[in-house]
Amino acid sequence: MSLLTEVETYVLSIVPSGPLKAEIAQRLEDVFAGKNTDLEALMEWLKTRPILSPLTKGILGFVFTLTVPSERGLQRRRFVQNALNGNGDPNNMDKAVKLYRKLKREITFHGAKEVALSYSAGALASCMGLIYNRMGTVTTEVAFGLVCATCEQIADSQHRSHRQMVTTTNPLIRHENRMVLASTTAKAMEQMAGSSEQAAEAMEVASQARQMVQAMRTIGTHPSSSAGLKDDLLENLQAYQKRMGVQMQRFR
């Protein structure tokens, strides 16, 4: 796996699924391929994206700044600086300085990542802030190692939280989660359907599913009534893809 592929993988792992994630993936690909060279416009676009947490925006801004060539005196962006200040915690800043000194001795991406993984996400963000604010310099490879370690820490805690939700025995939370998943699956089906004749069928199934979820929420239904809703939808989607000559079995 190439270095940039690895960076893209880690960064995208902390972005919530949805149309915005696809858009960010495209921007990262363009930036890494050298196709997008207007850092100012890129940062302005990032700043105004909804849904993303300030820290995720800060990490993306840091990655864009590392990758896109820019004039020497280009102003640092406040939204990135604020996100990478470790919540203003002096403890994070002390650890960030110690980590920075260790990173100065590293020359490889993997070496930097290994060193960084023993620190908390707050200290890692502060260390990125030091580098972003030009208070310290490391090689791009080492900076990317720091980015990936930070993303791994964040993704780990997101995964723990997600696992808690998936394994919860609370029927109301499970019911709502199934309805949310069915609704987002239906939305994805509508986006994929396009305008062919068979597409009308897929659109109809998706539309009915969304109406059903809406009705279930409006009138309040038994928690078990949503069981299998998403799987039914995915079966419909796969049947539609088969007719279109597309074989994708890994949606589940």
Swiss-Prot record:
It comes from the Viruses. Belongs to the influenza viruses Matrix protein M1 family. Plays critical roles in virus replication, from virus entry and uncoating to assembly and budding of the virus particle. M1 binding to ribonucleocapsids (RNPs) in nucleus seems to inhibit viral transcription. Interaction of viral NEP with M1-RNP is thought to promote nuclear export of the complex, which is targeted to the virion assembly site at the apical plasma membrane in polarized epithelial cells. Interactions with NA and HA may bring M1, a non-raft-associated protein, into lipid rafts. Forms a continuous shell on the inner side of the lipid bilayer in virion, where it binds the RNP. One of its GO terms (biological process) is viral budding from plasma membrane. The keyword ATP-binding does not apply. It is a peripheral membrane protein. A motif (Nuclear localization signal) lies at residues 101-105. Homodimer and homomultimer. Interacts with NEP. Binds ribonucleocapsid by both interacting with genomic RNA and NP protein. May interact with HA and NA. Cannot bind NP without genomic RNA. Its main location: virion. The gene is M. Pfam families: Flu_M1 (PF00598), Flu_M1_C (PF08289). GO terms for cellular component: host cell nucleus; membrane; virion membrane. This is Matrix protein 1. One of its GO terms (molecular function) is RNA binding. Most abundant protein in virion. When expressed alone can form virus-like particles in transfected cells. Residues 165-252 are annotated as: RNP-binding. It is found in: Virion membrane; Host nucleus. Keywords: Host nucleus, Membrane, RNA-binding, Viral matrix protein, Virion. Residues 1-164 are annotated as: Membrane-binding.
